[in-house]
Amino acid sequence: MTRKESELEGVTLLGNQGTNYLFEYAPEVLESFPNKHVNRDYFVKFNCPEFTSLCPKTGQPDFATIYISYIPDEKMVESKSLKLYLFSFRNHGDFHEDCMNIIMNDLIELMDPRYIEVWGKFTPRGGISIDPYTNYGRPGTKYEKMAEHRMMNHDMYPETIDNR
């Protein structure tokens, strides 16, 4: 089932050899395309092992692997635009928790997914790692209940956490 050119009109970055890498937070770079399988639930997961942002107080770099999982509805995020968007955090100064919530909010605004979760596993600084997790399920649907369940059971058993 090949996509029609009209379905890809909003996808401008994929295959573009003149990619402009932005060094400041740029949510406008995010692009979406239509989901051809709206009749079923399925997860899309992105693993982004090279996320970088800056500490808002010291300006020191913070490094993380970011996991973004979502159940799409009508729209899906285009992966190259997501890569460029995440790269735009390179010189953005914010706390880890804020970065994960900003990412989730921007993706909700772009796609209006049924469900989404964003998990950042930051490398230690000062001997402590921070792993913020945030999620969202569309209000009034089974996905809202799913979000509540996943949040209440997230990292419930520390002995089974293997993220380092």
Curated annotation (Swiss-Prot):
Q: Name one Pfam family in it.
A: QueF
- Which enzyme class? oxidoreductase
Swiss-Prot/TrEMBL catalytic activity: 7-aminomethyl-7-carbaguanine + 2 NADP(+) = 7-cyano-7-deazaguanine + 2 NADPH + 3 H(+)
Q: Where is the active site?
A: 55, 62
Question: InterPro entries recorded for this chain?
Answer: GTP-CH-I_C/QueF, NADPH_dep_7-cyano-7-deazaG_red, QueF, QueF_type1
Keyword Transport in the entry? The reply is no
Q: Which GO terms describe its molecular function?
A: preQ1 synthase activity
The EC number on file is: 1.7.1.13
**Binding-site positions, substrate:** 77-79, 96-97
Which pathway does this chain act in?
A: tRNA modification; tRNA-queuosine biosynthesis
Predominant cellular place of this UniProt entry's protein: cytoplasm
**Keyword set, alphabetical order:** Cytoplasm, NADP, Oxidoreductase, Queuosine biosynthesis
Q: Name one GO biological process term.
A: tRNA modification
Localization (cell): Cytoplasm
Q: Which domain of life is it from?
A: Bacteria
Coiled-coil-forming residues are none
Gene Ontology cellular-component terms listed: cytoplasm
* Record carries keyword Aminoacyl-tRNA synthetase: no
Indicate the family of this protein: Belongs to the GTP cyclohydrolase I family. QueF type 1 subfamily.
**Matches recorded under HAMAP family:** QueF_type1
The job of this chain, per UniProt, is described as: Catalyzes the NADPH-dependent reduction of 7-cyano-7-deazaguanine (preQ0) to 7-aminomethyl-7-deazaguanine (preQ1).
The family database entries (NCBIfam families) matched by this protein are listed as:
QueF-II
Question: Any idea what this protein is called?
Answer: NADPH-dependent 7-cyano-7-deazaguanine reductase
Q: Which gene encodes it?
A: queF
